[in-house]
Amino acid sequence: MLDKVKEIIVEQLGVDADQIKPESNFVDDLGADSLDTVELIMSFEEEFGVEIPDTEAEKIKTVQDVINYIEANKK
């Protein structure tokens, strides 16, 4: 799953895949702004078939946070 998440991040943010680690923070480490994070969440929802409510999306700060949420809520 990490590889697919990385692929989406590379596509959305234009960062090098080598920069993306599980502990990478979207804003601090990968340079995402608030619009980028919204677009990332929408891409993760579409790719993995999960719904991430705004209240949960606000808690997702790192790559590992996304993976944990998807694994816990995948249908």
UniProtKB/Swiss-Prot annotation:
Biological process (GO), any one: lipid A biosynthetic process
Domain Carrier: start-end pairs: 1-74
Source taxon at top rank: Bacteria
Keyword Chloroplast listed: no
Intracellular or extracellular location(s): Cytoplasm
Record PTM text: 4'-phosphopantetheine is transferred from CoA to a specific serine of apo-ACP by AcpS. This modification is essential for activity because fatty acids are bound in thioester linkage to the sulfhydryl of the prosthetic group.
Main location: cytoplasm
Single GO MF descriptor: acyl binding
A matching Pfam family: PP-binding
RNA-binding is among the record's keywords: no
InterPro entries registered for this protein in UniProt: ACP, ACP-like_sf, PKS_PP-bd, PP-bd_ACP, Ppantetheine_attach_site
Modified residues (O-(pantetheine 4'-phosphoryl)serine): 34
Pathway: Lipid metabolism; fatty acid biosynthesis
Any one annotated GO CC term: membrane
Key words of the record: Cytoplasm, Fatty acid biosynthesis, Fatty acid metabolism, Lipid biosynthesis, Lipid metabolism, Phosphopantetheine, Phosphoprotein
PANTHER family: ACYL CARRIER PROTEIN, CARRIER DOMAIN-CONTAINING PROTEIN
Role according to the record: Carrier of the growing fatty acid chain in fatty acid biosynthesis.
Xref: NCBIfam families: acyl_carrier, PRK00982.1-2, PRK00982.1-3, PRK00982.1-4, PRK00982.1-5
Similarity comment: family membership: Belongs to the acyl carrier protein (ACP) family.
Protein name: Acyl carrier protein
Organism: Fusobacterium nucleatum subsp. nucleatum (strain ATCC 25586 / DSM 15643 / BCRC 10681 / CIP 101130 / JCM 8532 / KCTC 2640 / LMG 13131 / VPI 4355)
Lineage summary: Bacteria, Fusobacteriati, Fusobacteriota, Fusobacteriia, Fusobacteriales
Gene of this entry: acpP
